[in-house]
Amino acid sequence: GFLGGGYGGGLGLGGYGGGYGLGGGLGGGLGAIGLAAAPAVGIAAAPAIGIAAAPATLVRTRVVPGPARLVQPPPVVQKQVIQPPPIVQTRLIEPPAQLVQGPPQVIHEQTPALIKTAVPAPSFGYKSLLH
């Protein structure tokens, strides 16, 4: 359970032991359950913050997909103290990189008609265009 793991938002990442909390908290047993709606939203900067009461809240957000980028969450050091006897287990959990949708972008595309730009190229070729 919650021993030494903290109470996290619980983004279930398979067999990653204590689980990687979406809010940055380490969900001791919640990581295995996971929020189904969370991966589509994708919070990138949250792991340092730690949201406490996240698992009960289900947020419905319609997101216009922006450019997707690969975000590698920071490694999580999980420390667990089991008593009695006092056993300290420390392990480094490297969460897999998540694909996070960037902010929505409105792209105004202009498709001009075929513009023929005649650039008179002197005898020394096209290198002059790059300078």
Swiss-Prot record:
The Sequence repeat ranges on this chain: 37-40, 45-48, 53-56
Keyword presence, Iron: no
GO MF assignments: structural constituent of cuticle
Record bears the keyword Mitochondrion: no
Recorded superkingdom: Eukaryota
Keyword line: Cuticle, Repeat
Annotated domain remarks: The tetrapeptide (A-A-P-[AV]) repeats found throughout the protein are also present in many proteins constituting the protective envelope of other species.
Functional summary from the UniProt entry: Component of the cuticle of migratory locust which contains more than 100 different structural proteins.
Record-given protein name: Cuticle protein 79, isoform B
Organism: Locusta migratoria (Migratory locust)
